[in-house]
């Protein structure tokens, strides 16, 4: 019996390495790595791979197997059902924990001025599969998630979102132009531009914002409160009260407003001073925008509506506080900033005028300028408005109240809702009004607002009565009152149905706000912020979002 040719066994180890010597390597395709060496490469990486792991896990450079799943690999294609299953199976607590650990390391490296390490950690974060998942989740949970960019693309299904994760790469990345629309500016008849990126560009901005945020928080002015993690307008108002309330506090205030801040920041300044991949940043800044089917270039500014824009604006304006501290040490010069609005106190008017020129010079380098119309110097006895509140001393006592403009805006907003609600059911109207009433009252609950709440309750009642009369022009007062208002406990005239009740402004009790510690960093002072949230014992949607930032490692109790 004639035997056939023997089957050649697959080459492994040395045999495979020898087999590639003639055909692989220099001048030809890359040599194939023996399959048996794969685990060695993981356990004992060399070259750039070793450097990257050393950044993540220190000198040993060993990467636990569970972390390998966080690195983005280009796998075989999956069906929509497979992708949807992968997205729905993501453990978001672990994702947030992984990203937060890297962000914490970036913040520590910034604090220690280890800029080379900062760049390596940023690279690791922006190429992390977990960070990409989180970036996609961020943009698909925002209010504008159903507003497409110029390409008309939306990520609605779980499959869309998982597919988007694999598309987040810096290789040959090119940002699409933004879609420009104009929206009404609150309290005015004018409109302001809003630029809408595509979904993929939003996610890329969110991804790089994750790597930039620890830097922004660590290097920020201590008295900057806008677009900051766990800081609020209420913190700014409490600090302003501390600076101005005492008998010997400074009496002059420079109210500063930057003209078109987001639209005019110098691109060159950003590229030379912001620690971020310069190629990617250039793509964000130079994308241009489309309006009325025409493409316009963007030579200045960061687009309003961009995910990363608030971070870039804050980084541009940080430094004013330290500049004033150097120029005017121990001279009652206090600086408070919220986004592009700021206050500077001064003991005399002449010093306030001098400070205005110092800030003007600081802004010029960054391509910005003060608004001549809105930048004014005011005496505390005359009062001034800041962030929707009026600050004024009455016979030596500083009071903070809701400003007239803020009261006018909420009244107009309620009027617009009632105008739209001509055919709504009472339950639909109550749901719409409760959102507005509770939100406005919570914003002002920490100041002298009890009288204002009572007046607004009266205004709201009169508006509701007119609304009911328009719905039933042929019915009498008694019938209308019985139809829409009821008794609840000791209260008469409660606007309610069998299911829902309209909340009043005065239902919100005045409660003083505890100011955040000025030097606290959310990436380095985790226990402080956890204790702060536990102490408040108020679970709002905002505080739930904050808890998700810290909810890994151990449970949060006492809420």
What do these predicted ranges mean?
Residues 429-475, 482-484:
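Non-catalytic, peripheral interaction segments enriched in hydrophobic/basic residues
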Residues 167, 171, 181, 219-223, ...:
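Conserved polymerase palm-domain catalytic core
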Residues 156-175:
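Amphipathic alpha-helical blocks
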Residues 1-162:
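Non-catalytic, polymerase-adjacent accessory regions of viral genome-replication enzymes
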Residues 459, 463, 468-559:
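Extended C-terminal regions of large enzymes
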Residues 185-188, 192-211, 218:
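Hydrophobic alpha-helical hairpins/lids featuring a short glycine-rich hinge
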Residues 193, 297-302, 415-429, 440-452, ...:
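Short, solvent-exposed helix-loop connector elements
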Residues 286, 366-432, 436-440:
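A conserved non-catalytic segment of reverse transcriptases
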């Amino acid at each position: 019996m004639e035997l056939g040719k023997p089957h050649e066994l697959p080459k492994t180890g040395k045999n495979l390495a020898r087999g590639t010597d003639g055909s692989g390597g220099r001048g030809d395709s890359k040599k194939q790595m023996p399959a048996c060496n794969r685990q060695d490469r993981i356990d004992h990486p060399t070259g750039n791979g070793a450097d990257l792991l050393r950044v993540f896990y220190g000198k040993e450079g060993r990467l636990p197997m569970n972390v390998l799943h966080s690195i983005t690999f280009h796998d075989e294609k999956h069906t929509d059902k497979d992708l949807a299953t992968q997205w729905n199976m993501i453990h978001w607590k672990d994702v947030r924990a992984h990203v937060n650990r890297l962000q914490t390391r970036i913040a520590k490296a910034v604090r220690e001025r280890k800029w080379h390490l900062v760049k390596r950690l940023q690279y690791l974060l922006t190429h992390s599969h977990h960070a990409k998942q989180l970036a996609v989740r961020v943009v698909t949970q925002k209010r504008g998630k159903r507003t497409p960019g110029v390409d008309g693309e939306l990520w609605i299904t779980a499959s869309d979102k998982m597919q988007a994760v694999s598309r987040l790469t810096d290789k040959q990345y090119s940002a699409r132009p933004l879609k420009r629309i104009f929206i009404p500016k609150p309290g005015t008849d004018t409109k302001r531009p809003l630029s809408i990126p595509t979904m993929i560009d939003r996610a890329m901005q969110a991804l790089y914002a994750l790597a930039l945020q620890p830097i922004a928080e660590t290097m920020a002015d201590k008295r900057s409160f806008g677009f900051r993690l766990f800081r609020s307008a209420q913190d700014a108002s409490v600090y302003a009260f501390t600076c101005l309330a005492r008998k010997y506090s400074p009496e002059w205030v420079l109210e500063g407003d930057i003209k078109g801040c987001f639209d005019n920041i110098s691109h060159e300044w950003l590229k030379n001073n912001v620690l971020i991949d310069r190629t990617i940043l250039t793509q964000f800044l130079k994308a241009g925008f489309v309006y009325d089917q025409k493409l316009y270039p963007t030579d200045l500014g960061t687009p309003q509506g961009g995910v990363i824009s608030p971070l870039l604006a804050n980084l541009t304006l940080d430094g004013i506080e330290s500049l004033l501290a150097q120029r005017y040490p121990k001279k009652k010069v206090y600086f408070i900033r919220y986004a592009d609005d700021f206050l500077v106190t001064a003991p005399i008017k002449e010093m306030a005028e001098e400070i205005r020129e110092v800030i003007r010079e600081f802004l010029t380098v960054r391509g910005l300028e003060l608004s001549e119309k809105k930048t004014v110097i005011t005496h505390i006895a005359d009062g001034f408005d800041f962030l929707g509140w009026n600050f004024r001393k009455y016979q030596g006592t500083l009071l903070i109240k809701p400003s007239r403009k803020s009261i006018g805006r909420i009244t107009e907003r309620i009027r617009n809702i009632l105008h739209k609600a001509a055919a709504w059911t009472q339950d639909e109207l109550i749901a719409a009004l409760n959102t507005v009433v509770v939100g406005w009252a919570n914003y002002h609950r920490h100041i002298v607002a009890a009288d204002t709440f009572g007046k607004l309750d009266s205004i709201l009642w009169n508006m509701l009565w007119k609304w009911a009369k328009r719905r039933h022009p042929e019915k009498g007062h008694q019938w209308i009152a019985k139809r829409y208002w009821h008794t609840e406990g000791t209260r008469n005239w409660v606007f309610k149905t069998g299911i829902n009740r309209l909340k009043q402004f005065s239902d919100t009790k005045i409660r003083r706000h505890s100011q955040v510690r000025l030097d606290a960093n959310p990436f380095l002072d985790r226990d402080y912020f956890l204790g702060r949230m536990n102490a408040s014992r108020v679970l709002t949607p905002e505080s739930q979002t904050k808890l998700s930032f810290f909810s890994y490692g151990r449970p949060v109790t006492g809420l």
